[in-house]
Structures are given as structure tokens and as C-alpha cells.
């Protein structure tokens, strides 16, 4: 896994030869699942499986099941801010107010916007979480399987919400943020519009434009003046 060093002091850009060799090992078709034995086989030597794109979301769903088992009706299941579930209401008997991080501020407390949330899962992915820069290029941890390189799709942050009607919403939103980030704003929005009812999202592009689906544009509060909503018609609001 050539970009595993991203976010460490020894991060480096792989050579074209290293990338070409690694690309030959990419593909879900090379993953064999044996449900009876609960086993997985990787067809080629050197392959690996990285569950980073779904692990937090899966954990959120499992904690939610534990809450349900013990009759807990209100609470915030928060795995580091990037994957969470807002259950019921907060101590003020109001929706939980979830801050979405500004993708270009070093201080993680700087928010792009706030989203009131109740009985819904939320995940956010961005190119600011783990990255290094070399030659004026930002190399981040969200890889495009088609190139083997960090995705250069025009997106810098993606937030997806799934309400309680969506099964395994934590894992699904975790997965979708990565997929939509790789697709980029235009393709990502079209893809989200094909999703079942109960799923909505917001994509931030490199020009600080917010592309949204569902009623996200109306629900986002305290939006930073750095950002504008993209209307899809070529005009900004």
C-alpha cells in the first residue's frame, strides 16, 4: 500500500513503476469470500484490504445497536467527528448541532457550517485529514482506484447524511463519502440523486462552492462566508 505513509514524517510520492505494479493488484474481483467458512482469500501476492473507508461507520452502527438493546433513546455516537450518529435529542431537547469542519483551516475547531441532526448518521471525508505536499501537489489519503493516486476530482470535502430509515446508515455514509469524493462534485451529485430516500449530501469543491442534494442547503446553519451554494445552473447564490 504505497500511500500508507501519508500523514507521517516519511511520506513520499511513489515512482511510476511502483504505481504500475500496485495497480495490477487492485480490484474487488480479486477478493474471494467464503461465507460458509467466514474466510477471505486474496488472489495475488502483495494484495491487502484497507477497511479505513467503512470501519468507523460500521462501529457507529454497532454502538447504535447496543444503545437500542438497553433502551437508550438520546445520545451522540461520535467517532472522531468524521463518523457519527445523532440519536434523539440533546439535553436542551433539541436536535444535535453538528459542526462540519472547514476544509482549509488548520484548526479543527474552525467550522464550515453547522447541521442540526436528529436520528441520523453523518460522515465527512476530506483531503485535509491526512496529507502531505510535494511539488505544489497535495497528496491525501483518499485514493482513486482507477489511477492508484490520491483523487484529483475537484472535491475537497464531502458530507453525507442518512436518516433512521436507511439500514446500516453509519457504514453507508462512511462508504459514500469516499466514493463521492473520488467521483467529484458533478458526478457525485448525480450519483447521490440516484440514492434512496433518506440519503442526502454536500460536496465542497476547490472554489469553496457547496453542491447539495435533498434539503441540505436549507438545513445548513452558520455557513462560513467563505462558501457559496452552487445552484447547478451556472449561477451562485
Model-derived regions: residue spans:
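Mature catalytic core of soluble alpha/beta enzymes
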Residues: 1-237
Amino acid at each position: 500500500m504505497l500511500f500508507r505513509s501519508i500523514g507521517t514524517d516519511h511520506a513520499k510520492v511513489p515512482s511510476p513503476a511502483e504505481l504500475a505494479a500496485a495497480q495490477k493488484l487492485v480490484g474487488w474481483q480479486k477478493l474471494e469470500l467464503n461465507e460458509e467458512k467466514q474466510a477471505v482469500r486474496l488472489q495475488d501476492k502483495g494484495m491487502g484490504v484497507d477497511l479505513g473507508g467503512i470501519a468507523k461507520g460500521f462501529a457507529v452502527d454497532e454502538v447504535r445497536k447496543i444503545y437500542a438493546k438497553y433502551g437508550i433513546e438520546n445520545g451522540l455516537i461520535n467517532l472522531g467527528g468524521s463518523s457519527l450518529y445523532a440519536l434523539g435529542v440533546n439535553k436542551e431537547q433539541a436536535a444535535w448541532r453538528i459542526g462540519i469542519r472547514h476544509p482549509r483551516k488548520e484548526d479543527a475547531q474552525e467550522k464550515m457550517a453547522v447541521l442540526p441532526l436528529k436520528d441520523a448518521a453523518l460522515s465527512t471525508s476530506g483531503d485535509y485529514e491526512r496529507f502531505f505536499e510535494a511539488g505544489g501537489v497535495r497528496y491525501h489519503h483518499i485514493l482513486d482506484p482507477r489511477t492508484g493516486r490520491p483523487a484529483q476530482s475537484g472535491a475537497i470535502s464531502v458530507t453525507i447524511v442518512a436518516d433512521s430509515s436507511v439500514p446500516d446508515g453509519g457504514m453507508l455514509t462512511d462508504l459514500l463519502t469516499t466514493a463521492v469524493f473520488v467521483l467529484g462534485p458533478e458526478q457525485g451529485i448525480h450519483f447521490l440523486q440516484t440514492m434512496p430516500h433518506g440519503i442526502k449530501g454536500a460536496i465542497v469543491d476547490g472554489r469553496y462552492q457547496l453542491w447539495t442534494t435533498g434539503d441540505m442547503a436549507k438545513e445548513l446553519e452558520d455557513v462560513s462566508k467563505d462558501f457559496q451554494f452552487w445552484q447547478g445552473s451556472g449561477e451562485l447564490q
